[in-house]
């Protein structure tokens, strides 16, 4: 006699077998290709993310993966190579400085960068300024101005607008949070402290921000452009690997950062012997700036627009003496060369004086 299991029991066995199968994880995807065209969105957070993403696309989409490896960098900040938007790299950085209103005119070479709107001459002084001067805060300020964010004052220093958010929360577009207790969303910013000799974290940075002496501090902030709980947060920052670079950080299923990689002060140096020290995501992540809801942003004063700077027109350059390779400008003739008489053959030497 053949024994047959009841049909309901067979169904239970089938469901149990399915439960033992691994659950497929949703594949994380870069949100920037879809976002970069939404710069005219009525939603301010979307506009912020869109301008940041469009800039990353212009730099050929370099990125830092979840393990902190930098990839895809094709063009560097001071090169004359064209970006995907046909603007030379050094010119694009000068545009971030100029259009954000943060160009420090007192610094060497900065004044020549102000001519970017009227001249495409590859100024060596401007390019030296771009190499020597961190421009990540200028990039953030450029994005926020393009997006029309109210309650945000751009600055050449990240610390200035972080301190402003901390001290003036009711008049600011951002609210300060500990990055380990906040859920990142598009339009937010995640910031770390650049101090090799000390780890700050949220509490020590908060103490510095509240101090009356206005102490300076090197910082860096990335703009959140996407967040996929259980997968990754996507952030875009300027002057990262000398480009505008996308960064990926792991997110837990609840939307919080999952084990945010943080420096400890005893991390190994980056070397072939200790590659674990080469993680570009390993930083002193100290503060998150949380974008306020749209209804609250609408009550803030409109974004500050500085008065237009009158930039004198550069004289047209017909030739150069200290020529830059690839500029397309011809070299000036030597000053001791005699002019060729009109109508004579330049290939033949002029006859000596007094010769008939």
Labelled PLM ranges:
Residues 22-28:
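Sec/Tat signal peptide C-region and signal peptidase I cleavage site
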Residues 9-21:
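Bacterial N-terminal signal peptides
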């Amino acid at each position: 006699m053949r024994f047959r299991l009841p049909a309901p029991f067979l169904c239970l066995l089938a469901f149990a077998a399915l439960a033992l199968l691994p659950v497929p994880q949703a594949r994380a995807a870069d949100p920037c290709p879809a976002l970069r065209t939404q710069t005219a969105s009525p939603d301010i957070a979307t506009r912020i993310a869109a301008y940041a993403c469009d800039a990353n696309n212009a730099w050929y989409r370099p990125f830092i993966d979840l393990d902190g490896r930098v990839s895809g960098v094709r063009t560097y900040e001071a090169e004359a190579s064209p970006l995907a938007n046909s603007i030379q790299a050094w010119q694009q950085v000068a545009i971030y400085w100029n259009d954000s209103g943060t160009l420090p005119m007192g610094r060497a070479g900065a004044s020549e960068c102000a001519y970017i709107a009227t001249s495409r001459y590859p100024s060596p002084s401007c390019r030296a300024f771009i190499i020597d001067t961190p421009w990540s805060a200028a990039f953030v300020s450029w994005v926020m101005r393009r997006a029309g964010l109210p309650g945000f004052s751009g600055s050449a220093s990240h610390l200035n607008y972080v301190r402003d958010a901390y001290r003036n929360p009711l008049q600011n577009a951002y609210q300060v949070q500990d990055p380990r207790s906040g859920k990142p969303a598009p339009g937010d910013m995640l910031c770390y402290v650049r101090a090799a000799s000390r780890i700050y974290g949220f509490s020590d940075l908060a103490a510095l921000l509240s101090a009356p002496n206005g102490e300076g501090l090197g910082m860096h902030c990335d703009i959140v452009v996407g967040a996929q709980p259980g997968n990754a947060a996507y952030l875009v920052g300027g002057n990262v690997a000398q480009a505008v670079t996308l960064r990926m950080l792991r997110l837990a299923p609840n939307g919080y950062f999952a084990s945010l990689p943080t420096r400890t002060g005893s991390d190994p140096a980056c070397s072939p012997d200790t590659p674990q020290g080469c993680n570009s995501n390993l930083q002193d992540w100290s503060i998150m700036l949380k974008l306020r809801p749209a209804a609250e942003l609408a009550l803030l004063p409109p974004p500050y627009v500085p008065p237009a700077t009158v930039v004198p027109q550069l004289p047209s350059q017909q030739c150069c003496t200290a020529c830059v390779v690839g500029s397309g400008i011809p070299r000036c003739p030597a000053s001791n060369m005699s002019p060729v008489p009109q109508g004579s053959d330049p290939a033949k030497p002029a006859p000596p004086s007094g010769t008939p």
